[in-house]
């Protein structure tokens, strides 16, 4: 393989630039040319493709976002549209493609693979919801952003003796809420993977108040439902002074953590190795701190599973 492409797709995550850098430098080290595809699958279809050199990826390892930009491209679900993308790849002499992104990006890579073009998926999403890897690129940075925000909110919650409901990202996965809530000692953590009883949440808050607790933190993954509605129910049932904070897109930005930079570098380089070995249709990951790769079709057939033991621990420690 003499020429490969790389793109980022879907929601951005801190560390994507480190992954791009690793792909480019690993490939060039092995005398393989690299072409960057801008704006994800949309750029692939339109032919927004440029050759990347060593200097193209200088001074980006510490930067959030993605140098290649990103976009969502629902029309890529159409086989005829994907064929246009494959034609663009062949036009530029590209023989393999590294796709950095989340579940939707993997779906695109899977479809390209099924249409005969070799792709390798690299997990880049703050949600940490990609099967086949313990951690995704961007999760650690987003987690630390959330923890920093909750630390600050707890300061004001303590000062004003308030209850705060804090909504974090995670439409289908509660990893950010669970890890941040546990790390910050949240009184309650609500995630999409676990049912909850609002009466139980209220009862726990009241028990805390009865033993002298003056403030509380509830961390809610967005997939659970409206944090505003939850806050209203709490205030109506308890008369506690309650505030709601939705952290939003601040979770996606910022300089990637050391862990995300290293993870992205390892995964990006491994993706290139797989293409060099002629192994398309794979996705890379890390499990027990060891690099792994899986069939991308089989990986997508699996479901991300929350750490139930950790969730139970959070409940036991927040009595």
Swiss-Prot record:
A GO cellular component annotation in the UniProt record: 6-phosphofructokinase complex
Annotated Pfam families: PFK
Top-tier EC class: transferase
Residues where substrate binds: 125-127, 162, 169-171, 222, 243, 249-252
Enzyme Commission code(s) on record: 2.7.1.11
MF terms in GO: 6-phosphofructokinase activity; AMP binding; ATP binding; fructose-6-phosphate binding; identical protein binding; metal ion binding; monosaccharide binding
Cofactors, names only: Mg(2+)
Gene Ontology terms: biological process: canonical glycolysis; fructose 1,6-bisphosphate metabolic process; fructose 6-phosphate metabolic process
Positions contributing to ADP binding: 21-25, 154, 185-187, 211, 213-215
InterPro entries tied to this protein: ATP_PFK, ATP_PFK_prok-type, PFKA_ATP_prok, Phosphofructokinase_CS, Phosphofructokinase_dom, PKF_sf
Protein name: ATP-dependent 6-phosphofructokinase
Gene source species: Bacillus cytotoxicus (strain DSM 22905 / CIP 110041 / 391-98 / NVH 391-98)
């Amino acid at each position: 393989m003499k020429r490969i492409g790389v793109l980022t797709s879907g929601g951005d995550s801190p560390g994507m630039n480190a992954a791009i850098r690793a792909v480019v430098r690993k490939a060039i080290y092995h005398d393989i040319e690299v072409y960057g595809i801008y704006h994800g699958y949309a750029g692939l279809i339109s032919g927004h493709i440029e050759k990347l050199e060593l200097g193209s990826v200088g001074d980006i390892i510490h930067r959030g976002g993605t140098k290649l930009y990103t976009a969502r491209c629902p029309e890529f679900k159409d086989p005829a549209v994907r064929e246009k993308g494959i034609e663009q790849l062949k036009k530029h002499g590209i023989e393999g493609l590294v796709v950095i992104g989340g579940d939707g990006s993997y779906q695109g890579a899977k479809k390209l693979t099924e249409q005969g073009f070799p792709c390798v998926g690299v997990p880049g999403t703050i949600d940490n919801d990609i099967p086949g890897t313990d951690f995704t690129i961007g999760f650690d940075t987003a987690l630390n952003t959330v923890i920093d925000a909750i630390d600050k909110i707890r300061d004001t919650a303590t000062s004003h003796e308030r209850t705060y409901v804090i909504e974090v990202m995670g439409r289908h996965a509660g990893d950010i809420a669970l890890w941040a809530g546990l790390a910050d000692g949240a009184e309650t953590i609500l995630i999409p993977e676990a049912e909850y009883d609002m009466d139980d949440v209220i009862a726990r808050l009241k028990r805390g108040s009865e033993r002298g607790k003056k403030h509380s933190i509830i961390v809610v993954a967005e997939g659970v439902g409206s944090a505003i509605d939850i806050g209203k129910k709490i205030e109506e049932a308890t008369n506690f002074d309650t505030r709601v904070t939705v952290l939003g897109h601040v979770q996606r930005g910022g300089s990637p953590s050391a862990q995300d930079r290293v993870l992205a570098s390892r995964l990006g380089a491994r993706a290139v190795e797989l293409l060099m070995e002629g192994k398309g249709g794979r996705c890379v990951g890390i499990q027990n701190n060891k690099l792994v790769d899986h069939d991308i079709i089989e990986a997508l057939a699996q479901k991300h599973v929350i750490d139930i033991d950790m969730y139970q621990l959070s409940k036991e420690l927040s009595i």
